[in-house]
Amino acid sequence: MKNIFFLFFAYLPLVMCSQQPETLKEKFADYFLIGATINQEDYQIIDKDEKILKIVSEDFSSVTPENSMKWMHSHPEYSKFTFSNAQKITDFAKDNDMYLLGHTLVWHNQVPDYVSKIEDKSKFNLHVKNHIFQLVTRFKGKVDMWDVVNEALNDDGTLRETVFLEMMGDNYIEKAFQYANDTDPNVELAYNDYNLYKPKKREGAIRIINSLKEKGIRIDAVGIQAHWDLHFPSIKEIEETIV
């Protein structure tokens, strides 16, 4: 499995100095990508804020739509897809030669109410399959990597109780990765979660990876969400998680 490292920053106002120092992406170009998220829904950054876009394009080498590709925004009604904001971010990323991380195809949060009202399990499965197909197809050749499944684990390493687990069974993760791979065998596919520095949760993620690999289902990367501060986790815990 390929090791791909990103360092992501949520946007914060920056004070520009008169000199032009080496940019962040130039400084770390030989080590890893420097990533930023763009929240188009709340701030309309692509439409309104050229200063922020200038900072993002000059200092960052990767971009992630914070909300635009999530189910609530991309597939708000049963038969309705809305890609306008996601497309704006995609165009910005490609125009600036940036790596684009698609986030996310299957997540228990920010899901429209209609999804949980689909009572027939076979129809639910087909709906998830179509959701993945539509998003991956729409951004095929543009998105470099998809977070296929996001935050499927509890901190004890067990699968989180979600509508996807209830309606598709405990192999719903395998199905999601297979659907994504079938739609675009060239895009990179990732599982993404937080608190993976905790041993039990990390073991759960490893079980997911091993299960996929044993069944011949492709997974290329694991996203480690860095919701950290100066006090935790320790450097040792971070290193153990990465290794």
Residue ranges and their predicted role:
Residues Q19-S62, E66:
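Boundary/entry segment of secreted carbohydrate-active catalytic domains
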Residues D42-D59, N125-V136, K201-L212, E237-T241:
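Short, acidic/polar
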Residues M1-L24:
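Bacterial Sec-dependent N-terminal signal peptides
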Residues E50-K51, E77-S79, V115-K117, L159-V163, ...:
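Short, glycine/charged-enriched secondary-structure capping and boundary segments
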Residues P21-E22, E58-P76, N85-Y197:
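Substrate-binding cleft and catalytic face of glycoside hydrolase catalytic domains
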Residues I38-D49, W71-S84, L153-D155, L196-G204, ...:
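Acidic-and-aromatic substrate-binding clefts and catalytic sites of carbohydrate-active enzymes
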Residues D91-Y99, M167-L189, R202-V243:
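Glycoside hydrolase catalytic-domain groove-lining segments
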